């Protein structure tokens, strides 16, 4: 089954914790706690709330950026953006047991992360998104197709998660490019019932698969 990663986001309606809770209630098994503007103490407080819930739901919990905190709290791993700690440095700190994901926008990024020891790639953005500042150039379907083709030619085997401005309607076409997973945030949180929206997406993906 193609995996769904939920990336936390604070809105007028929901806190970071509440956003993750609704995704978990909807059946999501992969949470990235992303609190880019928050101090480390706040991230730690939310992570401590989420960790037992993720364990109960058998869901993976990653922290965005906070490598030392991930090690301290013994969560499942981290996701590292282009301006975060380099992946090879994070691997030295965390060892092999932690999951390390990296953000990529080009095939050159993919090669760099692969050589550095990433476990998966978050490739995007698919289109413009309001949940992230300082966006790289949008990829669209053609971008994913091109990068995945280059990966195949180079014998680079890493799971690829599509990210950035993806709606429920986009998912079938994106999966056709050969990506392994989809990362969502705003699409779920803008829904009237985020938990129900998560369930719909997971059910739809099972039908596609």
Curated annotation (Swiss-Prot):
4-amino-2-methyl-5-(diphosphooxymethyl)pyrimidine binds at residues 32-36, 64, 103, 132. The keyword DNA repair does not apply. Mg(2+) binds at residues 65, 84. It catalyses: 2-[(2R,5Z)-2-carboxy-4-methylthiazol-5(2H)-ylidene]ethyl phosphate + 4-amino-2-methyl-5-(diphosphooxymethyl)pyrimidine + 2 H(+) = thiamine phosphate + CO2 + diphosphate; 2-(2-carboxy-4-methylthiazol-5-yl)ethyl phosphate + 4-amino-2-methyl-5-(diphosphooxymethyl)pyrimidine + 2 H(+) = thiamine phosphate + CO2 + diphosphate; 4-methyl-5-(2-phosphooxyethyl)-thiazole + 4-amino-2-methyl-5-(diphosphooxymethyl)pyrimidine + H(+) = thiamine phosphate + diphosphate. One of its GO terms (molecular function) is magnesium ion binding. It is an enzyme of class 2 (transferase). Condenses 4-methyl-5-(beta-hydroxyethyl)thiazole monophosphate (THZ-P) and 2-methyl-4-amino-5-hydroxymethyl pyrimidine pyrophosphate (HMP-PP) to form thiamine monophosphate (TMP). This is Thiamine-phosphate synthase. The lineage of its organism: Bacteria, Pseudomonadati, Bacteroidota, Bacteroidia, Bacteroidales.
């Amino acid at each position: 089954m193609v995996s769904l990663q939920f990336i936390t986001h604070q809105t007028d309606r929901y806190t970071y914790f509440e956003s993750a809770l609704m995704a978990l209630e909807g059946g999501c098994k992969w949470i990235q706690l992303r609190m880019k503007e928050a101090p480390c103490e706040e991230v730690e407080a939310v992570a401590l709330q989420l960790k037992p819930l993720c364990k109960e739901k058998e869901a993976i919990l990653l922290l965005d950026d906070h490598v030392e905190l991930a090690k301290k709290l013994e969560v499942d791993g981290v996701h590292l953006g282009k301006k975060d700690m380099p992946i090879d440095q994070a691997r030295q700190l965390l060892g092999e047991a932690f999951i390390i994901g990296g953000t990529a926008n080009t095939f050159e990024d993919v090669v760099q992360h692969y050589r550095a020891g990433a476990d998966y790639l978050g490739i995007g953005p698919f289109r413009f998104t309001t949940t992230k500042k300082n966006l790289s150039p949008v990829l669209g379907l053609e971008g994913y197709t091109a990068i995945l083709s280059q990966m195949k030619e180079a014998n680079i085997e890493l799971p690829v998660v599509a990210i950035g401005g993806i709606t429920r309607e986009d998912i079938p076409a994106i999966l056709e490019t050969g990506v392994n997973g989809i990362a969502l945030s705003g699409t779920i949180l803008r829904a009237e019932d985020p938990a129900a929206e998560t369930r719909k997406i997971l059910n739809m993906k099972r039908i596609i698969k």
